[in-house]
Amino acid sequence: VMFAHQSTEAWTTLCNSILGARMNITGSWPMDTEMANRSLGLAAAALESSVTVSCRPSERNGFETFKRVKKAIETKVTEEVNALYELGFRGADLLTACFGQAVSEFGKYETVEKADGSEVTVGELLELARTAAFNALLRGFDGDEYTRFYIGWLQMNGIGDTDFDDAAKFARVGM
């Protein structure tokens, strides 16, 4: 599946559709799919990349606790961030590509339950994935929200000029 949205709402819809079709995500990778010098209409937003999502039919195993799935997601997302970062991926697409890895863990089970017995939603899962990816970039740095944003930005983009659309996308997706 080629997916070009960065918003959590769009990802929630995609993941719910995949899981609802008894499929599971096996991987997700950012790909540059747009030309940098293309023309844009008035007030149009520019998309720089898409995420390729691979899926396969899945057999789900009963239920699992959120505590165990959370640990598995944090481990898998950290590994994915490190691998993609080493390959040169940066920007909000690096964080977004980790959504697929989180869903692959979550999708192994019919339900994932919190300690109070309520089910974990895909939206909550994606928030966990975003946090795990961002924490992997910060490698344990503990600071206030603005400092974490700044350090995360530097990790992914370095110092220099940045297109407004890139900064806006990171602000929406990156924290």
Where are these regions (language model features)?
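S-adenosyl-L-methionine-dependent nucleic acid methyltransferase catalytic domains
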Residues: 1-175
